[in-house]
Amino acid sequence: MPRFVDRVVIHTRAGSGGNGCASVHREKFKPLGGPDGGNGGRGGSVVFVVDPQVHTLLDFHFRPHVTAASGKQGMGSNRDGAAGADLEVKVPDGTVVLDDNGRLLADLVGAGTRFEAAAGGRGGLGNAALASRARKAPGFALLGEPGQARDLTLELKTVADVGLVGFPSAGKSSLVSVISAAKPKIADYPFTTLVPNLGVVAAGGHSFTVADVPGLIPGASQGRGLGLDFLRHIERCAVLVHVVNCATAEPGRDPISDIDALEAELAAYQPTLQGDAVLDDLAERPRAVVLNKIDVPEARELAEFVEDELAQRGWPVFLVSTVTRENLQPLIFGLWQMVSEYNAARPQAAPRRPVIRPVPVDDSGFDVQADGHGGFVVTGARPERWIGQTNFDNDEAVGYLADRLVRLGVEEELLRLGAKPGCAVTIGEMTFDWEPQTPAGGHVAMSGRGTDVRLERSDRVGAAERKAARRQRRERDDD
């Protein structure tokens, strides 16, 4: 079973809004109490929250579906439905949120940072909110809107001050184990490290974090080996350290060629966090070189031979041994000085404020196009939303939808394009046979609650008929 997961695809779905209520106030000595149906509650949203106690995306590996609660339905006596609770999903510090097209949506850094991944649907209006001078007691209410559904990719980019890069078996894990309290797996074969290891290093009264990245090979920036999976973990590192195995016996390998090969991979890698005002490009990050395994005599001679050539590049060079722990203290304090100087020269990250994006109210635009089969397709945010809010089992609700489309100008546009009565018109997921209701801007004839004269339906059971049916049932029971 994997214990460290740094990339997952999750399916988020916000809660739907509650339906509105169609109710009439009933009270003694008040025969005309009027409508009192409450509005539906807002659906809950899916919110990502950075939790410093979470260090992996393992939970999403087994439970990739995240669903928030829906809002409650409105009730009579002007009682609005309860809003659905927001679902707060805890993610590690350094999580990057990408959409299904790979576009960066959020970079979650810092404890408590929040990001609304999926917005909850709005609740439907009750008949009390729909009452007007022409429609004093609506016999219908609007349905709640569905919550937003999104497929998102979460990538964990380790937050560390120093990143150790090098070829397999260079001694990176051993170095982390001796300068910090971390205990990564160490063995004498390549690719022992399969997941990044973090360690906290104490430098006098200060401390900094070190990330041990799994070994890189030529072509890592194009996906060879585990390169693309773990190169992203060094994107946030302030200092990059080349760890070189000076005791390698492989033909064609030497410290200079190893460092040049690693630099070529770092230059070819395209990080996700491009354009970050706080981070430089990887090519501009401070570098240091650790020539490891100088406890071997031949390795010490080779390290001393290339030390001056590497120093000419302007990089600090440290000759160390993780076995004898030689020169570890100069390395620790040297890295701390590089980290502090880099952070002091960079602009401080501005406090991340929650971004409020109100739902636009000026969404009156729509478009009508012929579908090539004698019908028409109406597109637009407002008509499509109205379709989802309409209860098509209620005649008055359908008539109310027709009134809204008339006022918006949809029927006028259909007539202009040559639409004939009975042709198929598609709005959203609904296709119906279009019948002109009334000229655009004209007066709409109104009828009793729950009915619409334009639909010419007379199968609705009225209050008098229900009362007569109850009387007949009582008479049969008495007999």
From Swiss-Prot:
Chain sites annotated for binding Mg(2+): S173, T193
Domain Obg span(s) in chain numbering: 2-159
Bias-annotated ranges (Basic and acidic residues): 451-467
EC numbers on record: 3.6.5.-
Residues that coordinate or bind GTP: 166-173, 191-195, 212-215, 292-295, 321-323
Endpoints of the signal sequence: none
Cellular localization per UniProt: Cytoplasm
A Pfam family: GTP1_OBG
All copies of domain OCT, residue ranges: 358-436
Cofactor list: Mg(2+)
A single GO molecular function term of this UniProt record: GTP binding
CC terms in the record's Gene Ontology section: cytoplasm
Region (Disordered): 438-479
Domain (OBG-type G) ranges: 160-340
Main subcellular location: cytoplasm
Protein's GO biological process: ribosome biogenesis
UniProt KW keywords: Cytoplasm, GTP-binding, Hydrolase, Magnesium, Metal-binding, Nucleotide-binding
Classification via PANTHER family: DEVELOPMENTALLY REGULATED GTP-BINDING PROTEIN-RELATED (PTHR11702), MITOCHONDRIAL RIBOSOME-ASSOCIATED GTPASE 2 (PTHR11702:SF31)
Membership in a protein family: Belongs to the TRAFAC class OBG-HflX-like GTPase superfamily. OBG GTPase family.
Function: An essential GTPase which binds GTP, GDP and possibly (p)ppGpp with moderate affinity, with high nucleotide exchange rates and a fairly low GTP hydrolysis rate. Plays a role in control of the cell cycle, stress response, ribosome biogenesis and in those bacteria that undergo differentiation, in morphogenesis control.
Subunit structure: Monomer.
Protein name per Swiss-Prot or TrEMBL: GTPase Obg
Natural source organism: Mycobacterium ulcerans (strain Agy99)
